[in-house]
A protein has these predicted regions:
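N-terminal secretory signal peptides
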Residues: 1-17, 25-28, 37-41
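Right-handed parallel beta-helix/beta-solenoid
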Residues: 49-92, 551-557
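Extracellular beta-strand/beta-solenoid scaffold signature
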Residues: 135-145, 164-176, 191-204, 218, ...
């Protein structure tokens, strides 16, 4: 025997010895599955088979216990009796997930009861023909419930081919997350009422929902069948997470045609849900780079979230209420793309009387910064942005762009009594109005450096119901409005450095309660545009209308206002060199800042000293 042949034989013998040691150490004999020493029994001894259907046993499983197993290895499959329909695999499958930490689903599995995953750090993955489906009595239960921390579900397929669902009671669905630090990734969910949920009863922390497909999602609303029904607002979601520290990214959600579903992607905090609130409850949500399409009532939503990012998401059309919505949130940053295409004939959830919009803020919000792009599609009636309900204070900043290809009567912004609303660098095109506003005494609205190209059918910015409040417009551009500004009954109004073109009037004003400033504006029309104040030409408020180009107004002080030391003219905003028109036939110049400083008539040199 040569040296090479001898070395080769030694290597083969060495491998045989190593393999024998591995097999001996892993051998399991008998139904108890206890490990034995290598010389305890002949090598041909076989484990005692378990009785057919015995509880807690896996029929047909060999006697070697490993950390990893597959459903094909355990002979778990629902199509074993093809002629009589699917077999219930619940008992064997539940036992398998309790025994194995690393599990591959590579066969069709059907269950009639929720399977609970109780092993910490368990990993379950799908391959080949692996799929989990519910049997007929699971119209109100989830296929899997994760009850142990750090559970991972990868590459699985879940299907609800019988379209099981319930309008009340328990929810049909794919995965319920009742543990922390869990992940659902690269899975397919078909025809689910509630694909993935982390319920409020637990409040999961550190959840990751990444790169999944939620297809043909179902809803529990009655749609057009019953417009008086309020069903469907507690279920019918692709993903809903009640908890904190959640990341949802890279997912697709498509609603089944004709369904009245609730939400594609939803994150909600837990204020009041826990007796002792943890530091991280209802905080820190990332919702990024997801896509949603179809008749969900809203595609992307956050509720009661303190500290969230919604960015890079695309609402692809079909949302029946709102493309994105922010409800009772705080400290939220938003930058998404919304295509709003719901037909005005689709009235899903009409009993709730939703104000339809591409973007909505609801109830109350603080520190919400929205910088999204919006397209209102052909044939659609909706706002670009709306304060849909107002039960508290809204503190919101809005920017981005909005294009209206829908009804010519559409308005870009519906601002219903926001406490603090800032519009910065917003570009709108094709709308009838830039903004429809209702005010109260606590409202403050500012608009800075915005561009509005309107379609010639409505006012630019219009207060439809006013009772005080403050409106400031600075550096905006308005084109194609019948009247650029119709702003009655506000407390303080300032319009400065603004350009208006292709309009019939610059402004219609009335009922200004405290102060009015219209300065340094420009109208680039063939003829000057009127600024009309319907309460008369001499309002007893602090006002300044000056430095404007292409704007004509009949604002003028009276002799009584000029001579009274207590008039607003003398008490507020008086400065040396200020000139005012008096009775529309004389110009007076202030000779000082004090209320009693005299006024000089430039033509006659007459001096009037207030007293």
């Amino acid at each position: 025997m040569s040296i090479n042949e001898k070395a080769s034989e030694e290597r083969i013998n060495s491998r045989r010895k190593a393999l024998s040691k591995i097999l001996v150490s892993a051998a399991a004999l008998g139904t108890l599955g206890s490990l034995t020493r290598a010389n305890a029994a002949p090598a041909s001894a076989a484990p005692t088979p378990a009785p057919e259907g015995a509880a807690g046993k896996i029929n047909g499983a060999p006697g070697i216990i490993l950390d990893h197993a597959s459903t094909s290895w355990a002979k778990i499959r629902s199509d074993i009796h093809r002629g009589n329909g699917p077999v219930d695999n619940y008992a064997a499958f539940q036992q398998l997930v309790e025994d194995k930490k690393y599990l591959t689903i590579d066969t069709p599995v059907s269950i009639n009861k929720t399977v609970k995953l109780n092993l910490k750090n368990q990993i379950i993955e799908g391959r080949g023909n692996g799929i989990i489906t519910p049997l007929g009595n699971m119209g109100n239960g989830f296929l899997l419930e994760l009850t142990a921390d750090a559970t991972q579900i990868h590459g699985m397929v879940f299907d609800n081919p019988m379209l099981l669902k319930s309008e009340t009671g328990g929810r049909q669905g794919g995965i319920m997350i009742s543990a922390n630090f869990c992940e659902v990734s690269n899975c397919y969910f078909y025809r689910m009422l509630q694909s993935v949920i982390a319920p409020a009863s637990f409040g999961a922390y550190g959840t990751k929902i990444t790169n999944n497909w939620f297809l043909e999602c179902l809803g529990a609303g009655t749609g057009m069948r019953d417009l008086r029904s309020k069903l469907g607002e507690d279920r019918g979601d692709a993903v809903t997470i009640w908890g904190s520290g959640t990341i949802m990214t890279g997912n697709h959600a498509y609603c089944k045609a004709g369904e009245d579903a609730r939400l594609a992607f939803h994150a909600e905090g837990l204020p009041g849900a826990r007796k002792h609130v943890r530091d991280f409850d209802h905080k820190d949500i990332i919702m990024a780079n997801n896509m949603a399409k179809g008749s969900f009532r809203r595609h992307f939503a956050m509720e009661n979230i303190n500290g969230g990012i919604s960015i890079g998401n695309i609402s692809m059309g079909g949302a029946t209420w709102w493309g994105e919505a922010y409800i009772q949130c705080k400290n939220i940053n938003v930058k998404n793309t919304i295509r709003y295409s719901n037909s005005p004939d689709i009235l899903n959830g009409n009993a709730w009387r939703p104000i339809k919009a591409a973007i909505a803020v609801v109830n109350f919000n603080e520190g919400v910064n929205i910088d999204s792009t919006v397209l209102i599609a052909k044939g659609t009636k909706a706002y670009g942005f709306a304060i849909a309900t107002q039960t508290g204070d809204h503190d919101v900043t809005l920017s981005g762009s909005m294009i209206n290809e829908g009804a010519r009567t559409n308005t870009a912004l519906f601002l219903n009594q926001p406490k603090s609303f800032r519009i910065n660098n917003l570009d709108t095109r094709g709308f009838s109005r830039a903004a429809q506003i209702t005010t109260n005494e606590d409202v403050t609205i500012t608009s800075n450096n915005c561009y509005h190209q309107l379609n010639g059918t409505g006012k630019g910015v219009e207060v439809v119901k006013g009772s005080g409040g403050n409106i400031t417009i600075n550096g905006d551009t308005y084109s194609g409005a019948t009247t650029a500004f119709k702003l009655p009954n506000v407390a303080n109004l300032s319009i400065q450095n603004t350009r208006v073109s292709d309009s019939e009037r610059f402004a219609e004003l009335s009922g200004i309660k405290q102060s009015l400033m219209v300065t340094n504006n420009m109208c680039t029309t063939d003829q000057s545009l009127p600024l009309v104040y319907s309460d008369g030409a001499a309002p007893d408020i602090s006002w300044s209308v000056e430095g404007n180009i292409g704007i004509r107004s009949n604002f003028s002080c009276t002799s009584a206002q000029l001579s009274s030391i207590n008039s607003h003219l003398n008490q507020r905003n008086k400065h040396a060199g200020k000139n005012v028109s008096v009775n529309n036939n004389a110009v007076y110049v202030a000779l000082g800042n004090a209320p009693d400083a005299p006024w000089l008539n430039l033509a006659t040199q007459k001096v009037v000293k207030p007293a």
